[in-house]
Amino acid sequence: VPEEVLKPYADGEQTPSDIPAFLSVAAGYEILHNLRASVEYHFFDDKHAGMLNDRQKTLKHGTHEYLAGIEWDIIKELTISGGFQKTNYGLSNDFQTDTSFYCSSYSLGFGARVNFNESWSIDVAYFWTNYDDYTKTTESYNNTGVKGTDVYSRTNKVFGLSLNYHF
């Protein structure tokens, strides 16, 4: 393995990964007394946050996130909700590596709350993220002189359950 590949992981090595500037704009609206909706926009200025070997400079743009959600109190004891998120990274072939890659995505989430009384409730939720495949083709795969392709892909599914006490 070439030394430059392992250098970031050497004992005592410091790897910069600055927190980017962040802009968030959100609006919520109560459509009815028991029905609420919200939209949000997030921008992460990843392109100007310091990363190892100035990796941020290979991004095409910062990260854009678009979100929307709705919440409905069906009855006093039951609330359901749903939401959507679209994340768009400014990816490039030079940014993606085998040890650190990103994929643009969209997410769907659904949830419910059951209120037992004024103090106790239970929440249940499911969240699914579908990541876009990112295909990276190189003329010299891992410096072998042979053309090669990597497909970066993943998926994420989360189930949540909580028992809540309000005091």
Where are these regions (language model features)?
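Repeated loop/turn-to-beta-strand initiation elements of outer-membrane beta-barrel proteins
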Residues: 34-39, 77-80, 114-122
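Membrane-embedded beta-strands of outer-membrane beta-barrel proteins
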Residues: 25-27, 39, 68, 108-110, ...
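Residues that define the transmembrane beta-barrel architecture of outer-membrane proteins
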Residues: 19-23, 60-66, 104-108, 155-159
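Gram-negative outer-membrane beta-barrel proteins
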Residues: 1-8, 45-53, 88-94, 130-136
